[in-house]
């Protein structure tokens, strides 16, 4: 993404880490926090928060296109079995019609809403939280001033 920004393929990019460069402007854009989605009958569904280790060993649904989040299940839940779905339609059908746990995030819940008969529980491990950064060329910063002001206000609240 950074190379594309420098080649002018992109005007802005969002990254999961800050960038320091004389040519680039970088500011905090927002955060995302992973959640476990559990059916009400699950033994841990009453928890206020869970660690990845609490769910290690479970069979869970997992969507394949989760980007950098993919390392968490493979590194932190080695005893779990993941039923990996490549098609979003298949994944959506399974999460609506099965009792298997799956990962979600606060951003996904805000954008797509909650699913009936599901309880969303925050994951307490630090790696289940990410800060995103807005990056553009310094010379383009004025072009995005309205958007940057909106980001600033959002982060202040």
Which residues make up each language-model segment?
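Hydrophobic residues within well-ordered alpha-helices
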Residues: 4-6, 55, 93-99, 134
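Residues embedded in well-ordered beta-strands
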Residues: 35-37, 43, 101, 119, ...
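A ligand-binding cleft/hinge motif common to bilobed small-molecule-binding domains
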Residues: 14-22, 71-75, 89-121, 125-126
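Secondary-structure junction motif
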Residues: 56-81, 144-145
């Amino acid at each position: 993404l950074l190379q594309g920004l420098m080649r002018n393929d992109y005007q802005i990019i969002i990254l999961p880490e800050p960038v320091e460069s004389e040519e680039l402007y970088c500011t905090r854009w927002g955060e995302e926090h992973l959640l476990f989605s559990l059916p009400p009958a699950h033994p841990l569904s009453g928890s206020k928060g869970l660690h990845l280790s609490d769910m290690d060993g479970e069979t869970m649904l997992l969507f394949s296109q989760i980007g950098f989040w993919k390392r968490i299940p493979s590194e932190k839940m080695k005893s779990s079995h993941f039923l990996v779905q490549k098609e979003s339609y298949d994944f959506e059908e399974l999460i609506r019609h099965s009792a298997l746990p799956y990962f979600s995030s606060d951003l996904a819940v805000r954008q797509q809403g909650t699913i009936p008969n599901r309880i969303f529980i925050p994951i307490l491990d630090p790696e289940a939280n990410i800060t995103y950064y807005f990056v553009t060329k310094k010379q383009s910063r004025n072009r995005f001033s309205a958007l940057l002001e909106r980001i600033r206000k959002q982060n202040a609240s």
